[in-house]
Amino acid sequence: MKVLVIGSGGREHALAWKSSQDDAVTKVFVCPGNAGTALEEKLENISLDLNNFEEIADFCKNENIALVIIGPEQPLVMGMTDFLQAKDISTFGPSEAAAQLEGSKTFSKDFFVKYGIPTAGYAAFDSFDEALMHLDQIEFPTVVKADGLAAGKGVIICNTKNEAVNALESIFKDQTFGEAGSSVVIEDFLEGEEASFIAVVSKDKIIPLATSQDHKAVGEGDIGLNTGGMGAYSPAPIVDENIHQKIIDEVMTPTMHGLISEGSPYLGFLYAGLMIKDGEIKVLEFNCRFGDPETQPILLRLKSSLVELCLAAINDELESHEIEWTEKHSCGVVIASQGYPESYESNKLVSLPNNTESETKLFHAGTKLSNNEVLTSGGRVFCATALGDNLKEAQAKAYNLVDKVSFEGAFFRKDIGFKGIK
């Protein structure tokens, strides 16, 4: 069978790589893919207009694609799943309506309140002046969020009123996030430890994936600007059995049932970004796709077929489906371009290791091939990922792989995983 993965990041390299491991899969097309997917066995990059759903559907029909996995959020929010499913193409990803959980912070916060899902207190504004007046009524620190999709960078933690004013000016007046910043959510700052809970969902059925913890801030010690994520590890020790069950009971189940009540039953990866403190959980955000970089360490631990899992969800057969994980730990460290998450230079020549040790994988993100050479083409360039008998060993192997990759302006956080090492 043939699979099509939509996207070009580290997440999509991991999804395509994992799909290719299924013996039944003969070819995985990646659109548009990156240098990593171009170099993998059984993978092939293709160039299609991702805004032209008809062109994608025609390709799927002509190539007899058995499964489409949509990686990034933008095509989901634009309704790619709806279009392809209407053409009888097996597509794994939520509908346009269900993807509003990620597409609009205001929609998601209102949804949380309506269905009793624990979250931080908030207020939403589509006017700079009203948002500014609200700052006089709240305590600091606070969190200012652009309402729409901002590639994981639209969340600004403000320690003072002055910082919050600057954030609002950046969003409303400078239009830093474009249309995504036409309205904002201002919410209470939550303390605690973050965790990522990602599950495969089909209507009211759920298979939780391995837990993980992301590192959003650009700098060591979680300081600096928010990014799409600078590294992740799995499992996350903070999610013990009690917390795990609590997340399913208080977050995932009411979300699934709420979406059914709204007429938008969910299909796809559903990712809850959580804050955990003293055994209590609150939802920071929902993402309607696999996290990046969480995908890379999580899929390194998955022993079962990803393709069979996705097809079981599409065919409403999750209830009888089981998946298997390695007991080993994994750690993924992002290597980024100097200047990320703000402006950075591209087209830097990359030096890669000739071989890597067992149980390690270098996933490409912002890379491209030019005359058989690998060049940088994005802010996050690689995710060096490794398995180990414990997190400390996985971390050491991941950083050992990081040291073998070089390009001008490369940087990475040196503390990925330390929170999970006791």
Regions found by a protein language model. Name each.
Residues 158-295:
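Internal nucleotide-binding/catalytic subdomain
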Residues 21, 38-39, 92, 114-116, ...:
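Solvent-exposed alpha-helices and their adjacent loops that cap or buttress functional pockets
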Residues 4-5, 101-183, 213, 237, ...:
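Active-site nucleotide/adenylate-binding loops and adjacent lid/helix of ATP-dependent enzymes
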Residues 367-371, 375-422:
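Generic C-terminus detector
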Residues 1-96:
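ATP-binding N-terminal substructure of ATP-dependent carboxylate-amine bond-forming enzymes
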Residues 248-270, 287-359, 370:
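Active-site "cap" helix and flanking loop/linker of ATP-utilizing ligase/carboxylase catalytic domains
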Residues 39-41, 55-57, 100-106, 219-220:
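Short, charged, surface-exposed secondary-structure boundary motifs
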